[in-house]
């Protein structure tokens, strides 16, 4: 008899627990490196400063392109003028670093004392002559990765509506220079590699090698990526006109997607996210279907990647994984791990936008049915106390959790993996699927190694709860 599970619907619950996630201002750590001509000014208290220093591990005298505008008692009691203080700091930044854009990051404190950053920015911008983008990344309203979402949503509103004539001439000049000495036929052949389709903009901050990989994967299908949000330089933000197509690469960018659709009148391609070979294939297929292109060689590409992952998959096949919820990548990671042969009883997630993640949820459902496993229960804003009771009952082989709960769970004999590592690792596209499994299997491999050494007391069987 086959153990096929009867088709059922995904169940959603909301426990309205507190956000137990990394602070969203941590988005500065990867965004300041991604946008090379930017300067990030975090407006908050000493606590925010300590967090940034510890979380980023960057020494202040290394002069990174971010800084803290530390609020003092005078700011909170309204004895100091916010505008004058911020003007003084921004002029200092302009003099020392001369960035193309200054990004103000609002924190919990600016939210509580009702600092009108959005009101101050336009006036100060016209006075100092540098664009000022305001993004709220407070931990009261947002989970870990949603800090990036607010920054990109603010930047989406700043994307130019049309290419300036000067820029057109400069681009044409560069293209002529690059094609100098090449035959006309070669240049024409390169242009003809692409199918004629409406412009496509991809949004989401990814490391440069991953950006190149995804761009090339689409190029193989004849699809040209007209631009990325964010670009490497603020001055190179993509032109976005009404009717352009946009696609996201991360599941936590729902606000950016909404801004692009409502304010910039773009058409969103609702696809699963390119995490794991299955997600990458589905993402490319969906973009191809929107443009009426028949995808080429994707089935073979996916099969080849799965064969390369088999050594890691053997370690996790038949094991269970439990997501406590932290970075909003949970649905995509669960879908990929279920495809690898794991079971997942519960997915905790701080915030769930069912419209933006619709395609991903449908793919999760389909994957569970194809693999013959039960659908996970999805819990939004989970209550940690209840969650830990469920972990004790279920005894999963691995818990993917925020840093705060990792050591207490390990002490009780439960294998854990920090969810924050998936945020900072390269996990998108076909070739990076191995990195996901490298992270997931590390605690399991460590325990196997300890068992082989005979150190049983350090392994979960001996742990006293």
Curated annotation (Swiss-Prot):
Q: According to its UniProt record, which cofactors does this protein need?
A: [4Fe-4S] cluster
Which Pfam families has this protein been placed in?
Answer: Oxidored_nitro
Q: Which GO terms describe its biological process?
A: light-independent chlorophyll biosynthetic process; photosynthesis, dark reaction
Query: Which chemical reaction does it catalyze?
Result: chlorophyllide a + oxidized 2[4Fe-4S]-[ferredoxin] + 2 ADP + 2 phosphate = protochlorophyllide a + reduced 2[4Fe-4S]-[ferredoxin] + 2 ATP + 2 H2O
Which pairs are disulfide-linked? Answer: none
Q: How is the cofactor bound?
A: Binds 1 [4Fe-4S] cluster per heterodimer. The cluster is bound at the heterodimer interface by residues from both subunits.
Keyword terms = 4Fe-4S, ATP-binding, Chlorophyll biosynthesis, Iron, Iron-sulfur, Metal-binding, Nucleotide-binding, Oxidoreductase, Photosynthesis
SUPFAM superfamilies the record matches? Helical backbone' metal receptor (SSF53807)
E.C. no: 1.3.7.7
Binding of [4Fe-4S] cluster, residues: 23, 48, 108
Superkingdom of origin organism: Bacteria
Q: What class of enzyme is it?
A: oxidoreductase
Q: Which GO terms describe its molecular function?
A: 4 iron, 4 sulfur cluster binding; ATP binding; metal ion binding; oxidoreductase activity, acting on iron-sulfur proteins as donors; oxidoreductase activity, acting on the CH-CH group of donors, iron-sulfur protein as acceptor
- Which pathway does UniProt place it in? Porphyrin-containing compound metabolism; chlorophyll biosynthesis (light-independent)
What family is this?
Belongs to the BchN/ChlN family.
Instruction: Give the record's subunit note.
Output: Protochlorophyllide reductase is composed of three subunits; ChlL, ChlN and ChlB. Forms a heterotetramer of two ChlB and two ChlN subunits.
HAMAP family xref list: ChlN_BchN
Q: What does this protein do?
A: Component of the dark-operative protochlorophyllide reductase (DPOR) that uses Mg-ATP and reduced ferredoxin to reduce ring D of protochlorophyllide (Pchlide) to form chlorophyllide a (Chlide). This reaction is light-independent. The NB-protein (ChlN-ChlB) is the catalytic component of the complex.
- Supply the name of the protein: Light-independent protochlorophyllide reductase subunit N
Q: Which gene encodes it?
A: chlN
């Amino acid at each position: 008899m086959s153990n096929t599970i009867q088709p059922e619907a995904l169940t959603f619950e909301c426990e309205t627990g507190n956000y137990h996630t990394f602070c969203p201002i941590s988005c500065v750590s990867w965004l300041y490196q991604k946008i090379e001509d930017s300067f990030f000014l975090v407006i908050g208290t000493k606590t925010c400063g300590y967090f940034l220093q510890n979380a980023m591990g960057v020494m202040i005298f290394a002069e990174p392109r971010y800084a803290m505008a530390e609020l003092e008692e005078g700011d909170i009691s309204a004895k100091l003028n916010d505008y004058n203080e911020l003007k003084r700091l921004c002029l200092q930044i302009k003099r020392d670093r001369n960035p193309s854009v200054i990004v103000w990051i609002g924190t919990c404190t600016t939210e509580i004392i009702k600092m009108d950053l959005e009101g101050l920015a336009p006036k100060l911008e016209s006075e100092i002559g540098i664009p000022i983008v305001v993004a709220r990344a407070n931990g009261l309203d947002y989970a870990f990765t949603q800090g990036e979402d607010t920054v990109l949503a603010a930047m989406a509103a700043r994307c130019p509506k049309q290419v300036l004539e000067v820029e057109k001439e400069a681009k044409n000049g560069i293209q002529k220079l690059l094609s100098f000495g090449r035959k006309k036929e070669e240049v024409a052949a390169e242009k003809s590699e692409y199918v004629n389709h409406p412009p496509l903009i991809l949004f989401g901050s990814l490391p440069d090698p991953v950006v190149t990989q995804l761009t090339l994967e689409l190029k193989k299908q004849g699809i040209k990526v007209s631009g990325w949000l964010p670009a490497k330089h603020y001055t190179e933000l993509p032109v976005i006109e009404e009717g352009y197509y946009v696609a996201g690469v991360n599941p936590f960018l729902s606000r950016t997607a909404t801004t692009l659709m409502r304010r910039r009148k773009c058409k969103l391609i609702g696809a699963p996210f390119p995490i794991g070979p299955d997600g990458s294939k589905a993402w490319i297929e969906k973009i191809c279907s929107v443009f009426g292109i028949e995808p080429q060689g994707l089935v073979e590409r996916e099969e080849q990647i799965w064969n390369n992952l088999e050594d890691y998959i053997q370690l996790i096949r038949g094991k269970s994984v439990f997501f406590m919820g932290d970075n909003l990548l949970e649905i995509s990671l669960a879908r990929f791990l279920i495809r690898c042969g794991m079971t997942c009883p519960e997915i905790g997630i701080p915030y769930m936008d069912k419209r933006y993640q619709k395609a991903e949820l449908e793919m999760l459902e389909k994957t569970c049915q194809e693999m013959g496993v039960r659908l996970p229960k999805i819990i939004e804003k989970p209550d940690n106390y209840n969650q830990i009771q469920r972990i004790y009952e279920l005894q999963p082989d691995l818990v993917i959790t925020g840093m705060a709960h990792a050591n207490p769970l390990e002490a009780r004999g439960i294998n854990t993996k920090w969810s924050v590592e998936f945020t900072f690792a390269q996990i998108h596209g076909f070739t990076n699927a191995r990195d996901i499994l490298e992270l997931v299997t590390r605690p399991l491999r460590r325990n196997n190694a300890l068992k082989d050494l005979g150190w049983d007391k350090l392994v979960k069987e001996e742990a006293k709860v």
